[in-house]
Amino acid sequence: MSEQKAFNLKIDEQNIAWLGIDVPNEKMNTLQAAFADEMKAIFAQLKDSSGLKGLIVHSLKPDNFVAGADVRMLEACKTAPEAEALARQGQELFQQLSDLPYPVVAAIHGPCLGGGLELALACDFRVCSDDDATRLGLPEVQLGLLPGSGGTQRLPRLIGLLPSLDLILTGKQLRANKAKKLGVVDACVPQTILLDVAKQFVEKGKKRAKQKVTTKEKLLSGSGLGRKFVFEQAAKKTHEKTRGNYPATVAILQVIQHGLEKGMKQGLELEAKRFGELVMSNESKALRSIFFATTEMKKETGSEAKPSKVGMVGVLGGGLMGAGISHVSVAKAKVPVRIKDVSNDGVLNALKYNYKLFDKQRKRRILSKAQLQSKMLQLSGGTDFTSFNRTDVVIEAVFEDLSLKQQMVADIEANAKPETIFATNTSSLPIHKIAEKAQRPENIVGLHYFSPVEKMPLVEVIPHESTSEETIATVVALAKKQGKTPIVVKDQAGFYVNRILAPYMNESAHILLANEPIDKIDTALLDFGFPVGPITLLDEVGVDIGAKIMPILVAELGARFKGPDVFDVLLNDGRKGRKSGKGFYTYKGKKKEVDKSVYKLLKLTPESKLSDNDIALRCVLPMLNEAVRCLDDGIIRSPRDGDIGAIFGIGFPPFLGGPFRYMDQFGLKELVEKMNQFAEKYGDRFAPCDGLLTRAGEGRRFYDN
C-alpha cells in the first residue's frame, strides 16, 4: 500500500494541474518541514511538464485551506541558524511555485493563515469562498515571530505598505470580503463555484502583471522620505502599544523596510535571519507555550463523564454580567436564552445590550439585517419563570448576596427540570455554601466569568464536593461553545484568579500609601506588560467590589490578605471608581486623569522614590507567591492552568508565559532571594511560601521544558 501524501498532483484533460493539499491523519492542513522533499519533487515535475495551461492549488479538506506552519517543528530547533534554515526552506519552495511559467491560482476555502497565506501569496492569483469560515491573515506576531516564508516581502508589494503593516503587526485575520477589498484576493465567490472561478483565471493564460503602484503608494513606500515617515510613525505607535516588550514588532518593521529599500532578495535574507533569532527568544517561547496550552485545553473535558446536551440556557439577572453571558450563549454557543430579572427594565437592559453588540457586527458587515433579527429572536425574557422548565443550564448572575443566591437555587429547583444545572457566576462566595440548602447539590457548580464577558476569554469552573462529573463536563463543554477557555478550580475563597489578584492589588495600595504617585504605579505595571495598571483596574472593577471581596479572603485564608485601609475612606467620599465618575481617577467620557484630591483625602504627599522595576516587582512577587500556594493547595490542577488563568483572567503579560513560566525563567533561587530582600525591607507579606522554598532548595522547576 502506497504511503499517503500531503500534496496530491493531478492533471486533467484540459492540461490544468490540480495540487490538492491533504495532510494525512490531521483535521487541519499545516505545513511541515517533513513535506519539503515531496513539494520539491512536485514543483520539479510541474516545471518540466510541457503544455500545462496552469496550476490550481486547493485543499482536499472540507473546511480549511492551510491553517499555517506546524508550530511544533520550531520546538526541535536548538539554535537560531536551525530555525533560520527552516524559513529559508519555505522561502525557496514558495519561490519555485512563483517561478512556474504559467498562471498559478490558489483556491481558498476556510482558514488560510500564516504559512498558508504565504503559500497563496506566492501564487499569481487568489480566489476565496465568501463563507464565514474563510479567514486570511499572518498571525505569526502573536507567537512572537514574523512571517518567515516571504510574507513580509510579498504582502506589501501586493496591497501596499500601510495595510500590510496593519495586518502583519497585529496578526489580525480578514474575512473574505475584506480580503477582496484590500486586494489580498482577486475574487470572492460562493464555495460552490470556487474551483470553476479558479479555472477561469487559469484559462486567461496570463501570469500576474506587475502591480500598478498608486500615487499614494509611490509617496509612502516608493520614496525614501515617505518610507522614513511611515516607519517612524509605525515604530512610535507600536512602541506605545507594546512598550518594547515584543521584539517581533521591531523585527517586522526592520525586515519590511529593508526589503523595500534593498530589494526582495535581501529582504528575504533578513526575514529568515530575524525569524531564526525570534524563534529562540524568551518572548516567543513563552507565547508558543500559551498556544500549545490552549490547543491542549480545547481537547480536554474537565471530567471523566460525558457532557449532556444543552438546548436552552436560562440567565438570572439582566445586569452587565447577565447581559454578556446571554450574548455569548446566543452568538457563540448558538443556543436560545431566556432571561429573568426582578424588573422589566432589567430584561430590557440585557436585550438592548445584545442588540447593540449584534448591530455593531451588522455595521461591520459581519451580520446581515436578517441574521441580526434571527439572533435577537433567540433571546427572550420576563420577570417570572416562564420557559425555565425547558432550560438545561441556568446561569445565575445576581448580586453577591448568599441568601439571595440560595433563594435562586430554590426557585430553579422548583421551576426547572430535575436535571437542570444551576451555575452561579459568583466571584467570591463559596459554591458549597450556595448549594447548602439545595435538594440536588450535584447539579450546582460555579461558573465565574470575567467582565466584559463578550471580550474576556477565561471562565473558572468551580465544582464543590457534591458536584457531579456530568455537571462539570456539561458546563466545560458549554463554556467552550461560548468561546471561552475554561479552567477547573477548587471551591475556596477567591477561587484562583481573584486569589492571586488580591495581594497584587493590596501591594499597589501599600505603595500608594508610601507616597508614590498614582500614575507612576500604573505606568510601572503597564511597562512590565499588564494591559492596565492596578490602580486603574481597581477603578474599573469598582472600589465597592474590592471592599466586599477582601474581607471574605481575610476570613477564609488569613491575615496575609489584609490590605491597607483605603476602601472605606474612598467609599465614604462617594468614590466607587469609573461607574461613579470618580475613584483614584476622574472620568469625563473616555478621558481619565488622576484625581489629585485623593492624595489629600488619604493624607499623602506624592513623591516618586522607587524605580519602575521595584514598583512592578513589589506588586508581582506577592501574586507569584499566592499562585504557588494555589498550586500546592490544589486550587488549580497544574502550572499550565495557572498560567492560562492569569493571562486570560487578569492580563498577566503573555510574553512572560504566565506566573509559573515567569518564575522558571526568573530562577526559583533568585526569586526566593529577591522575596527575602523585600521581606526584610517591606514586611513579612513578601516571605516566600513553603512550596517555593522547597522547590528552590531542590533545584526544581514548574515545567520540565
UniProtKB/Swiss-Prot annotation:
One of its GO terms (cellular component) is cytoplasm. GO terms for biological process: fatty acid beta-oxidation. Its EC number is 4.2.1.17, 5.1.2.3, 1.1.1.35. It catalyses: a (3S)-3-hydroxyacyl-CoA = a (2E)-enoyl-CoA + H2O; a 4-saturated-(3S)-3-hydroxyacyl-CoA = a (3E)-enoyl-CoA + H2O; a (3S)-3-hydroxyacyl-CoA + NAD(+) = a 3-oxoacyl-CoA + NADH + H(+); (3S)-3-hydroxybutanoyl-CoA = (3R)-3-hydroxybutanoyl-CoA. Pathway: Lipid metabolism; fatty acid beta-oxidation. One of its GO terms (molecular function) is NAD+ binding. The record marks E118, E140 as: Important for catalytic activity. It is found in: Cytoplasm. InterPro entries: 3-OHacyl-CoA_DH_CS (IPR006180), 3-OHacyl-CoA_DH_NAD-bd (IPR006176), 3HC_DH_C (IPR006108), 6-PGluconate_DH-like_C_sf (IPR008927), ClpP/crotonase-like_dom_sf (IPR029045), Enoyl-CoA_hyd/isom_CS (IPR018376), Enoyl-CoA_hydra/iso (IPR001753), FA_oxidation_alpha_subunit (IPR050136). It comes from the Bacteria. Signal peptide: none annotated. Keywords: Cytoplasm, Fatty acid metabolism, Isomerase, Lipid degradation, Lipid metabolism, Lyase, Multifunctional enzyme, NAD, Oxidoreductase. Residues 308-705 are annotated as: 3-hydroxyacyl-CoA dehydrogenase. Residues 1-190 are annotated as: Enoyl-CoA hydratase. In the N-terminal section; belongs to the enoyl-CoA hydratase/isomerase family. Heterotetramer of two alpha chains (FadJ) and two beta chains (FadI). Catalyzes the formation of a hydroxyacyl-CoA by addition of water on enoyl-CoA. Also exhibits 3-hydroxyacyl-CoA epimerase and 3-hydroxyacyl-CoA dehydrogenase activities. This is Fatty acid oxidation complex subunit alpha. It comes from Vibrio vulnificus (strain CMCP6).
